[in-house]
Amino acid sequence: VTGKDTLLDDFCDLAPWQAIAPGAARLKLRHARDGDGCVLHLDYDLAGGGFVIARRALALTLPEDYAFTLERRGHGGQHIVEFKLVDDSLANVWRLRDEHFALGAEWTPWHIAARDIIYAWGARRTRRLAHCDALEIAVVGSGRGTLSLRNLRLCDLGYDATPRVRASSAEAAHPAIEVLGDDPRHWRSAAIGEQTLTLDFGRERAFSAVHIDWLRDALPVAHAIDVRDADGTWQCRHHSEQRPGPRSTVLLPDTRSSGLRLRVDGGAARAAVRHIGFAPWYYAPNLYDGLASMALEAAPGVYPKALREQQSYWTVTGAAAGSGVALINTEGLVEVDGGDFAVEPFVAAGATLFTWADVKLEAALEDDCLPLPRVRWCGPGFTLDIAPVMLGSGDDSALDVRYRLSHHGSTPETFALELAVRPFLVTPIWQQWQGHGGIAPLHHLAVDGGGLTVNHARRLAVTPAADAVVAERDAGESLLEALRGAQGVVAREVEDDAGLASAGLVFRRTLGAGQSVDIHARVTAGGVRNACTDAGLAHARAADEWRSRLGVAPLRLPAAQRAPVLTLLTAAAHILVNRRDARLQPGPRRYTRAYLRDAVGMGTALARLGMVEPLKRLLDWYGPFQRDDGELPDCVDDDGAEWLPEYDAYGQYLHGVAEALRLAPDPAFLARQWPRAQRVLARLESLRARRLDEQYRDTACFGLLPESMSHEGYMAQPVHAYWDDFWALRGLRDVAWLAAQAGDEHEARRIAALAVEFRTDLHASLARSMATHGIDFIPGSVELGDFDATAIAIALTVADDGDGLPRAALDATFDRYLAIRAERSDSTRWSNYSAYEIRIVGALLRLGRRDDALAVLHALLADCRPAAWRQWPEQSWRDYDAPAFLGDLPHSWIGAEYIHALTSAFAYEHHDDASLVLAAGVDGAWLHDEGVTVTALATHHGPLSYRLRRLDAQRVEMHVDAGITLPAGGLVLRPPLPAPLRALTVNGIARHDFDQASWRCHALPAHIVFVCGDQP
């Protein structure tokens, strides 16, 4: 390392250092003399898994290029070690993460370059950290050991010299040195043909891009850039045979060199360069960040919004019978299924080019609910409607995007629709997973037969034919400039090793007042050209297929109140779109895995809407991954099964099997699944047995499942999570029922008794944990006593255990949540939340807190992102445009939780009194006009149908149809009443067996009139 060196810490004073060790992990900091300085020892014990942090307050203004250096040694095997820089909030972190950090007995150098310290998390996403307030060293993993450090230094590696410049020839008035100056100075060659301009830096310097400003009257016909290697040889890093625009920005990520050579061919004219500039390492530490830097320098709209480090929301489209998933974002960028590339629209009207940043943007769905999204550009005198659909299935699938350009002016006008294929994706870089996100390199583009072949794999065909097609190596502004005057095919093929190949198709039309034109762009796999040949019918056919697939919603509300039901249908459709064959997965790009908890939640949600087959297919596919001892993987994806200790899986699997059979009896499915369910039960019992030893008798862990990481907050340090236990309670009850269905009454009684025993231990544990931690709410785990209302909600919804838990603790839990939600509404002192909170709706209504439940429901409905697409990300940020991780979008598990919450507002089963509760979450505002209609809503007792409406200020009418099998505890009718119930008639006969809010029905059909308030 060369540069200005500063000693930051000789480790002779431990006072600035702080040891942080969450959970069961331990960390001791100590130091010892070592020559002229000291050694800092981090003695750590990570127990079964966790992390420790040594933090030092250290306010530093960092130079443009730098490196931290230390020496290290130690013992303890291989761990993950992180070197982190933190700002004053301690919430924004940049880090180097070494996942293979090995320790040995000898001192070895530890060099941490600025370019290796990257943004990790927080709200201040920047590539270069200019100032830090603390330094952290974290050790992650398991086991124990010692990490020893000495001699912490900061080296300033910035380049402040002036390069030596020479040219192959130069006019006397315009010498080579002029390229380092400012306009109007410039270098001009004295000769024609290829000329060279060489810059010698005098020492190695870091840069990541070269900016070349050309003279507008002397643009070259070709140019190339060479950089000098450490051994003095020149390597070509860029070559172009196309005439550039006034400025060329050549991205050269992570370049360190002692010299640069520009080769310029001015054609018949002499070569000329106005200025050459070098971008620092953080301008383009990689290809994506370089493009993002260029986007920030360009006018808004020239590049996709996400490249300008602003959030861009997207949604999915897919065929009702297919498996491909395409994306469209709110700006109209369409990403093909598989994420291979995307298509961007631009509109030229006269001399003006319109981009997404120059128009009003509107989002919509077909029928206001189908997964057939549209984006409308509203420009001056025109609109552009962008509507992608997936057609067909398997090898015969295709993406068809219809661009409808409409003229709204009073006189004819000529427009040009320009479709660009550049290496950009809808999926932002902050969503990157397994190489997907931000960009998709385009190495090869070929123009053929009115379309393009992309990377030798995908074909984009257009109807009608384009008026011009342009292909080039530059993915920046020069493509848009080339499209403006292009005629015919400008280039038939382009290859680019850097992956920056791009192409554009131009469609010019003169439109009269009120006229429209449709342009279709169809993307198929290589060799597949006619998935659905009639472009005009493709979109209507896709809509009809989705209407047929979703059927009629089992819930109907007044026209002005339809949003909850429309969102229900969209949520169901998104589950179907995001799936891959039998694999139900929560997202289209980032979460393309079948997490069992997500998948069962999605499958049971569809089953509640009458679509049981996806749940059965899921379980038949997932079941064979089970091991002989009953162990289940927590997740399965393209790489196979994942075997993390996530013990919620067992209750979830059993619940999925039972729900499928309760909602659609199927003896063959029962026969297939009962042996697996028995093995799941055996595994569940063996897990619980680990906490039945005498050593746990007087602890809060007795009788529970072992430590687990099924909750994301417990990944670093597994704990006894009550989430797992409530799922286990549900699973035990369900497998007892399954045993009875399988004809094993003895086993059914044994398991039912086991469920009662487990419930008793669970309640005792909760009481002990609350006392230990001194809390009045239901905790999320034994060890932490943590507040987690979203997880605890399943105690009332999934586990149906509300009657057994202390009411005061339940109210305290959800009162605290509601206070947090209210604070979010009234302040800016929060950053993000997760719409998993929709689970709390079902918990609140089961507590009889209808108004609170509806307040949460309506608040979350109002925060769909965007509202017109009726979807939620996993993470919703206060700053709508913050370039922050969303999880995935649409997040189908959240959509499934919404389906469960909304359907339970109309009907839910109650275990302890064997009843079916109706209308406990119905909003009184829904009773106006035609009121509420429930048609064949799936329940454990058969399809439920009823109607509910307000007759006048004091009377509510309800009609429950026959056809359902009445449960032993009857139907508990709990409609929204304007005042306490005063009188009630059933089929015209007065009844007196009611309370202030409900009546229990034991015979159908029943026509009930609820009379409320004081005597008239």
Spans of features found by a protein language model:
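Aromatic-rich carbohydrate-recognition surfaces in CAZymes
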Residues: 407, 432, 446, 453, ...
